[in-house]
């Protein structure tokens, strides 16, 4: 299962890293209030998965107005079977919509060969993910206009995006099975099968 170590928030002018593994009560409370506020508009990549992950850590994600993962699908993009990892999809989308040559995004940050993400010093790790978050921000803007051109925007805003919240909540809640109801159904079908045999 994925582990939530922190959140990076990016605006047009700056970025903020929140370390959720060592967060004060005041900051946790402020973040919880912000992330759950539907009036605070957010761009979230993979909204359904992020909502489920944040909920596991006690946060409710609301207020997302853009999800480039969904909007790219609405515009006809389907990730290749061998390019479904998060970083790979970001690279492919950036090449398709932002004309950034396909390469590891760390190459935009590091002058030499990039180290493993698990070996990166803290500062360089943040630089890498800040770059990725800015790419996501720009993808959301471009794909919004693309959906507008394809007359997909209303469907996206009124149906598809709200549906991600429903699907996330359903997947996390799971399915409850009632033994009593199953037994009743079994008895009903068995009775009907017996009646059908007698009438045959």
Residue locations for each model-derived region?
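Conserved RNase H-like, two-metal-ion catalytic cores of nucleic-acid enzymes
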Residues: 1-96, 174, 190
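Glycine-rich, acidic and aromatic/proline-enriched surface loops and short helix-turn segments
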Residues: 99
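Mixed-charge, glycine-rich, non-catalytic linkers/tails in nucleic-acid processing enzymes
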Residues: 62, 103-200
